[in-house]
Amino acid sequence: MEKYEREAKEAGRETWYLSWALDSTTQERAKGKTVEVGRAYFETAARRYTVLDAPGHKTYVPSMISGAAQADVAILVISARKGEFETGFEKGGQTREHIMLVKTAGVTKVVVVINKMDDPTVGWEEERFKEIKDKLTPFIKSAGFNTKTDVIWIPISAYTGVNVKDRATKAQVSWLTGPSLLETLDTIPLIDRKINGPVIMPISEKYKDLGTMVVGKLESGRVKKGDSLVMMPNKVNVEVLAIYSESEEEINYAFGGDNVRLRIKGIEDEDVSPGFVLASAARPVHSVKRFEAQLAILDHKNIICAGYSAVMHVHTLAEEVQLSALLHYFDKKTGRKSRKPPQFAKRGQKIIAQIEASDLVCIERFADYPQLGRFTLRDEGKTVAIGKVTRLLAIDENVITEGVSNIALGNTASSTAE
């Protein structure tokens, strides 16, 4: 941190030095904004953590979605400074969209960190903390989170370190009780991992370093050095040469839930793209161009008809897709789907549509594998719909019914994209 402090001071950005630990590019440090998903690793006495620092600015929401798709817990950092919270939460601000996107990505636990409580406009006032909590709670609830069991609220000052690692003392904050941020994270229940299932690892990054390196979160299964896997949708057989943890240490095994870097052979790095999936050769994930999905239309100024195009974000993939047909709509009162196809869809409606991608995409039915079956549609810088895959369609019009999760996988997370 001394190095970051010295470099930030030389660049005239002395007060930004803490952010330089994750904002590593010249562009990010010059603008004071996170652009790419920064990665860091740390340990407490109880657990090992991988931090995915996702951008907050609306221009970089696609990068934020990629980060959320790899997370188990979302830490929503809110500024308590007067005016900053209001700007982020008002219509057009990013706080609302980020809450909805992390839910769509399958994150089930949210820690809302109210930062900058030491700011002169706040002065660690309990009323400001309560005001922000009261305003955010209804919206977090409407996004699908249980605010009593799935959401935790922590006031902190990241700059001074108060209530981050150690609990705030009464001398620092007279009204605050309860655990610090790191203490809270250490007590969040761990997610059941599908370590006995087939290997599924969506690729978030790739680069060349004595071979082809791929980075991602192992969603299912286990990997060891020497394993033969298949890169989808290319269907290229590869071999695992080495496995590295987030601490850059070479390890012998990786299990479901681990964020890892793999050195593989059998494919060049230029033939791998974010959104590809490393899978078991015996049970590769599906790769299709056409599928059916249930969509909830969120925010679109015009009606949506067959032929509408948008960018689909699913796990670590961003791909242009087209709604080739609208098949059914759901009656708001009865919840039943229509027999006749709708002519159009508009904000607030739920529909079933047939979707066609411009290229092969690695997806699964939501019912079989939620992490590869939930997605968002974005257009003109806005999230216009959230959806879940209900059917995979082969080129010959047949419905693909068997997914990777039809073999024993253990527990599967159960959350909806509604």
What do these predicted ranges mean?
Residues 4, 79-81, 108-130, 152-171, ...:
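G-domain G4 guanine-recognition motif of GTPases
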Residues 130-302:
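Conserved catalytic-core segments of large NTP-driven translation/proteostasis enzymes
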Residues 124-126, 267-418:
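C-terminal effector modules of nucleic-acid-centric enzymes and ribosome-associated factors
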Residues 1-62, 71-84:
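P-loop NTPase switch module centered on the Walker A-proximal segment
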Residues 47-50, 54-60, 69-130:
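Conserved Switch II/interswitch segment of TRAFAC-class P-loop GTPases
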Residues 1-4, 32, 53, 64, ...:
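Residue-level signature of catalytic and energy-coupling elements of molecular machines
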Residues 7-11, 25-28, 67, 71, ...:
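Conserved, well-folded catalytic cores of nucleic-acid-processing
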